[in-house]
Amino acid sequence: ILLDEIIQPLNCDPNYIKRVIKKYIARDAYNNTSAVCTDTTLLERFDTSRVICPEDRALATGKALNCKDLRYNRIPLDSKGHPHPSFTGVPLYHDTILRSPLVLDTIALWPVRDIYCNIAVTYEDIDLGRIGCVQKYMRMWSIREWWCNGERVRTCIPLIEIVDREAPYVHCPYPI
């Protein structure tokens, strides 16, 4: 049973952003209680070098989006009518958990569920226009860590191309 939780910000600590102190007791079926147990956790600072940027969704990578999929609502759109990040990819945080066996974990950084770790993740699309049958967007992701009266920013800029891959088809039911 959690009795108390104290969150202490560690301003300007080079390694940690917060100390979380939790006090617990255990209670059995006969209502007997244990002594108070205190658990202290230090939250490490966000390491921007562990960010994995989304891949380009472009012809060059073989991962361009098909305009037919947009037309038939097979690709979700964001509030501005652009392909939604849940479909095109979001920045990930790659972490290594040291134990046996070694565990590699990736965590989606968007949408940010809270700012408990002093980070914010946002994106903005820049419309590069249409060239021939290719519509291009440059998606600018900003991953910000606030620390010690300043901030560190990591930027990811994947390219998103929407391509018309199919020629028109004309069906002539009668001979001309």
For every predicted segment, state its role.
Residues I1-I176:
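Proline-threonine-serine-rich low-complexity tracts
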